[in-house]
């Protein structure tokens, strides 16, 4: 496992390259995108690596197979949920081999590795299922109706709402759920702002009361 890059770290080193291979894809052109971070990691560690988001890394660890990547978490790396493919501009790059094989959310990936099951005394029949982003999970767990929306305070502040069709606008991402779409946008500000108003001890106590 190599060095990770924080979610809120801007990576401007490959700005010109990114703009040339992501024409019209504003969500990929920000210095905070997964693509910007991926290219920075490739510059540092070379192309004989695999690029995985946190959830894909953990799932792969349980399977002892890091082949796969879940569709929602890989949008900011360039995965097109509508066309279900990576951008054509990626095809001739030397780093395409670093990308995961994308699988839809909710699909069974396989059973837990036998050695890990024995090590942690887990049922060897446990199946690993591809997940989704944290804010999508919060939206689904809330059980909201089609006319309702949700604000999620996490690393970022995210606003989500169900829509019949994907919304292709700057700053908006759309995630497929069955025949509908969870559409929303996120800021680069999040729960870190709480540290300006509460001490670590107060945050710990307030969190305990949730």
Regions found by a protein language model. Name each.
Residues 2-12, 74-78:
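A charged helix-plus-loop insertion that forms the helical arch/lid used to bind
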Residues 96:
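Internal glycine-rich flexible loops
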Residues 104-112:
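Glycine-rich phosphate-binding loops at beta-strand->alpha-helix junctions
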Residues 53, 103-104:
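Short acidic/polar alpha-helix capping motifs at helix-coil junctions
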Residues 13-67, 76-93, 114-210:
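Active-site core segments that coordinate phosphate-bearing ligands/cofactors
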